[in-house]
């Protein structure tokens, strides 16, 4: 497997797109071939590398150019307050990144908030997307079976409002199914990321007041997505309900759904080997 590090793949680019003027986006890049852009979730301290470090090497070895993008207002990208729903604004930033790097089309891989971003991108810029891979994405609106917001989302907002190591630990315990995977190294790395950019936390809460989670619902437009779509879900996801996967499957024309048992909200990390195999096989298919 290709040996990669965060520091050796770290890059910045300025984007200019609606709502972004000379805005610094941080990303990690490795490999050659068709471009795969991986989009992280929306928890405090999230970033491209921490979300996808178990996936980037196998995708590079499979012959892809992989970009792990830090969304606006996360990790090393510039701070921002958003007046519109975050998935749509983030989708514009993805387009801005692609324009700045001269990328005509890319496959998108999105987890949680990153999945909402990918859905919005597929709707707004269909000519710029190859295939779509989603892991427990936000954006499908109300649930038929689970009260919303779910337990994990409540803990996520609690951590944003009251950042502490204990609140982080509580969120991660709900985040993952297998509690043995929760190490001090994992928690400390995420905690350090949270502390590096306190402005990001404040801005997220302000943005959530301007455009609450209810505005993220793109159900009415899912039928516009023509990209081949691979949806994955953790059976034990306590952040985004499993029935959202069925809603996506029913509404996206060319979609398939895979459910991981004994899996929480982070399928690409908790079941990395199986996820990598399934996702790469999907990309390779005609």
Swiss-Prot record:
What functional role does this protein have? Catalyzes an unusual C-C bond hydrolysis of 2-hydroxy-6-oxo-6-phenylhexa-2,4-dienoic acid (HOPDA) to produce benzoic acid and 2-hydroxy-2,4-pentadienoic acid (HPD).
Q: What's one GO-annotated cellular component?
A: membrane
Induction cue: By biphenyl.
- NCBIfam families from the UniProt entry: biphenyl_bphD (TIGR03343)
Q: Which organism is it from?
A: Metapseudomonas furukawaii
Query: What GO biological process terms are annotated to this protein in UniProt?
Result: acylglycerol catabolic process; biphenyl catabolic process
Q: How does the annotation summarize its subunit structure?
A: Homodimer.
- Catalytic activity field: 2,6-dioxo-6-phenylhexa-3-enoate + H2O = 2-oxopent-4-enoate + benzoate + H(+)
Keyword Hydrolase attributed = yes
InterPro entries, per the entry = AB_hydrolase_1, AB_hydrolase_fold, AB_hydrolase_sf, Epox_hydrolase-like, HOPD_hydrolase_BphD
Name the active site residues: 265
- Keywords assigned by UniProt, alphabetized: Aromatic hydrocarbons catabolism, Hydrolase
Give the Enzyme Commission number.
3.7.1.8
Q: What family is this? A: Belongs to the AB hydrolase superfamily. BphD family.
Q: In which pathway does it act?
A: Xenobiotic degradation; biphenyl degradation; 2-hydroxy-2,4-pentadienoate and benzoate from biphenyl: step 4/4
Q: Per its record, how is this protein called by name?
A: 2-hydroxy-6-oxo-6-phenylhexa-2,4-dienoate hydrolase
Which residues make up the binding site for substrate? 42-43, 51, 111, 180, 190, 266
Q: Where is this site: Transition state stabilizer?
A: 112
Please list the GO terms describing molecular function.
2,6-dioxo-6-phenylhexa-3-enoate hydrolase activity; 2-hydroxy-6-oxonona-2,4-dienedioate hydrolase activity; monoacylglycerol lipase activity
Domain AB hydrolase-1: from-to ranges? 36-271
* HAMAP family xref list: Biphenyl_BphD
Q: Which Pfam families match?
A: Abhydrolase_1 (PF00561)
């Amino acid at each position: 497997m290709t040996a990669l590090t965060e520091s050796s793949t770290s890059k910045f680019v300025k984007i200019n797109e609606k709502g972004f003027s000379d805005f610094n986006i941080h990303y990690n890049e490795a490999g050659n071939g068709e471009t795969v852009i991986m989009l992280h979730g929306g928890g405090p301290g999230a970033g491209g590398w921490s979300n996808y470090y178990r996936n980037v090497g196998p995708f590079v070895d499979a012959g892809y150019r992989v970009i792990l993008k830090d969304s606006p207002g996360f990790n090393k990208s510039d701070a921002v307050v958003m007046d519109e729903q975050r998935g749509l604004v983030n989708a514009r930033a993805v387009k801005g990144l692609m324009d700045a790097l001269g990328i005509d089309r890319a496959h998108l891989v999105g987890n949680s908030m990153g999945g909402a971003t990918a859905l919005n991108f597929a709707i707004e810029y269909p000519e710029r997307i190859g295939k779509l891979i989603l892991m427990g994405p936000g954006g499908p609106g109300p649930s038929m079976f689970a009260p919303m917001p779910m337990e994990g989302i409540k803990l996520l907002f609690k951590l944003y409002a009251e950042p502490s190591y204990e609140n982080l630990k509580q969120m991660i315990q709900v985040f993952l199914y297998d509690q043995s995977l929760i190490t001090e190294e994992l928690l400390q790395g995420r905690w350090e990321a949270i502390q590096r950019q306190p402005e990001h936390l404040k801005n997220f809460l302000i943005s959530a007041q301007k455009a609450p989670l209810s505005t993220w619902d793109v159900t009415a437009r899912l039928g516009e997505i023509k990209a081949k779509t691979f949806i994955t879900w953790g059976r034990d996801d306590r952040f985004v309900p499993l029935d959202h996967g069925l809603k996506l499957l029913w509404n996206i024309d060319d979609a398939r759904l895979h459910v991981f048992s004994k899996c929480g909200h982070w399928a690409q990390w908790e079941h990395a080997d199986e996820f990598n195999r399934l996702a790469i096989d999907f990309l390779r298919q005609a």
